[in-house]
Amino acid sequence: MAKSIRKRVITVQYISLFVSIILFASSCAVQKAQRSLLNTPALKGAHVGIAVYNDTKGAWIDQHQSDYYYTPASNTKILATYVGLQFLGDSIPGWKMAENADTLFLFPQGDPSFLHPEFSYQPVVDLIQKTNKQVVIATTQSNDRFESMGDGWAWNDYAEDYQPERSRMPVYGNVVHFYDNGKSLQIKPFHFFKNQDIQYEAVKAKQWSRKKSTNDFFVTTQKNSAKYFQVPFVTNPEKDIQLLNDSLHIAKPIQVLKYSPQLAQRTIKTVPTDSLLKIMMSRSDNFYAEQVVLLGSAQLLGRIDDATFMDSLIKTEFNFLPQPMRWADGSGLSRYNLNTPENYVAILKQMQAKFGESRVKNIFEKGGEGTLSAYYKNFPGTLYAKTGTLGGQIALSGFIYTKRQQKLYFSVLVANHMSKTTSAVRKAVEAYLVEIAKRN
């Protein structure tokens, strides 16, 4: 009997020792992977924040400067995704409407899909074209508090396709769409070019731009062989109605609403929320992210006031964060945004718990797709993540399902790197995460 007990004790001791050796080896491997990342030549002089959490085991795997602040760039779109899932329902609450005997009143709420070529479903366009009533649109609301450009944006990027203006009533995505088929140049909307005589041979394979404060478009000396490209236009509530009339060609021209009628309003839902968020995350669409935040503000506050909306969410929806964050816009274009790796891990955990694992997975991009198309193709498991890039800043936050059935949340934020190419930094982060996934 005593011999049997001693045998069991020895067996337990051996098992404990074996487990300890495995854990020690795993810990050493993680530390080695971390050192390899931090010592990468592309990251010389940079600041790197790392947070990796094993949700299956409920334990941190790796942390390095994980409570330090970084400019997260497009990782800010993770917050915009949270807003969309929390406030926008199954389909975008893009408009409100009311009507009386002879007039249809429309109240835009910031829907980015309106007349956007990417979306064939256009319920508001159908409504406008089918009604016999006079259509009037409230293009502004007196208690709105937001600017066409986000706080901290680069002012001289006004003509870049990644920085369209924000508005209560976006039209065509607030950009001019150029289609070059090799024989002709199609422009949509053509509203801004009606007085121009555009000869294709003179503009073929050329880049277009515009003046800073007006919709005066012109061809630059820069080459552009793209078959499709965009240039943002200057939004203006009343002039956008002219653009709308020029596009829809309805019998009774749309008018601007000068007063708010005392009539019951109902919501017009447009495109599926998850479809919009999926596109936003896949190509890191700044315009969609900004408009999602404006839509969220309209839903929660009854007005578009992005600063008040984001401040309110920091105190309520995001009061669980380990560190207080600074949130300046929806897209991450602003360098005023500040966040930590630990915060992103906490946000990702909360999103899956609150909105469902499968729903969140369907919105995030997998390795080898979208902005991750050049990375994580042969990953030991499955990685879902959001990238982020600004000058000197690189970000990647997401979650991993390893081959050993472990779920990991991670965030790697890099500040002030001086690498000539972002790919060198991204490959170093990829090598690190590959090692982490192999060991878990």
Residue ranges and their predicted role:
Residues 1-37:
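Bacterial Sec-dependent N-terminal signal peptides
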Residues 71-84:
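Active/ligand-binding-proximal structured segments within catalytic/core domains
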